[in-house]
Curated annotation (Swiss-Prot):
Its biological purpose: Provides the (R)-glutamate required for cell wall biosynthesis.
Keyword Isomerase: yes
Superkingdom assignment: Bacteria
BP term (GO), one: regulation of cell shape
Pathway terms, separated by semicolons: Cell wall biogenesis; peptidoglycan biosynthesis
Protein name (record): Glutamate racemase
Binding residues for substrate: 28-29, 60-61, 93-94, 205-206
Keyword Aminoacyl-tRNA synthetase: no
Reactions accelerated catalytically: L-glutamate = D-glutamate
One example GO MF annotation: glutamate racemase activity
Active site: 92, 204
EC number: 5.1.1.3
């Protein structure tokens, strides 16, 4: 199942500097990557975490591929110049599908991407109908269709691309209520089906943040599947076997690309996730 938001009583795990720990960057265009970070942190609580989100170019789902690749490389480079990294997680499905080759060519540390959890969903479905809920960019990309052909060719795949759901997830973290009517409208093609998907892949890292609302709207018993736990396990393996010795004793920190009022409003949320401060990251280009 998708991960749930932490409640307000979650302790700040890195409130004070401690012994040097491996430094891991988790990056997304927005705050959806916090769902992936949360899975990694639960498995690996004793790391030095950096969360970076690109609130200047958000959302990536509507941007062209060349722009995304250049932008992601610039941001990871800027973080690496401040904190030598043991590993980076691109916690954005859109960015992962286009930028991983460039990142892995440029940097010596491991880079982990996020891909839609098509394979486990194909194993879990009972009625053979799997829904893929993602951004329009992820739904259209050939990489997604290759995953389906490879791992779910015996399933009926129903795809929905939505930029509005990304905005709903961002708004939720800003303290706004999520409109169930808006979700029903987005999901209407599935809700009208005689036999809708019994398993839904959350193919955007923002969407686990809407798990509770999605379960209220989708038919009872619908399974929600995301790749957060698998990314956490992959991160643990790479840190043990392939990551360079890049450590820091600093507190966990979050970076935005522009310190807007909206970004400042996220500080209490980020602190609940264990990040002590939010700073603007200077990015060249």
């Amino acid at each position: 199942m998708a991960t749930k938001l932490q409640d307000g009583n979650t302790p700040c795990l890195a409130a004070t500097p401690s012994e040097p720990r491996p430094t891991v960057l988790v990056f997304d265009s927005g705050v959806g990557g916090l769902s992936v970070y949360d899975e990694i942190r639960h498995l690996l609580p004793d790391l030095h975490y950096i969360y970076a989100f690109d609130n200047v170019a958000f959302p990536y789902g509507e941007k062209n591929e060349d722009f995304i690749v250049e932008r992601v490389v610039e941001i990871v480079t800027a973080v690496q110049e401040r904190y030598p990294l043991a590993l980076a997680v691109v916690a954005c499905n859109t960015a992962s599908t286009v930028s991983l080759p460039a990142l892995r060519e440029k940097f010596a540390f491991p880079v982990v991407g996020v891909v839609p959890a098509i394979k486990p969903a194909a194993r879990l479905t009972a009625n053979g109908i799997v829904g893929l809920l993602a951004t329009r960019g992820t739904v259209k990309r050939s990489y997604t269709h290759e995953l389906i052909a490879r791992f779910a060719n015996e399933c009926q795949i129903e795809m929905l691309g939505s930029a509005e759901m990304v905005e709903l997830a961002e708004a939720k973290l800003h303290g706004e209520d999520v409109s169930l009517d808006a979700l029903k409208r987005i999901l209407r093609p599935w809700l009208r089906m005689k036999e809708p998907p019994d398993t839904v892949v959350l193919g955007c890292t923002h969407f686990p943040l809407l798990q509770e609302e999605l379960l209220q709207v989708l038919p009872e018993g619908t399974r929600l599947v995301d790749s957060g736990a698998a990314i956490a396990r992959r991160t643990a393996w790479l840190l043990e076997h392939e990551a360079p010795d890049a450590k820091s004793a600093d507190a966990n920190i979050a970076f935005c690309m522009d310190m807007t009022p909206e970004a400042e409003q996220l500080l209490p949320v980020l602190q609940r996730y264990g990040f002590k401060t939010l700073e603007k990251l200077a990015v060249s280009g």
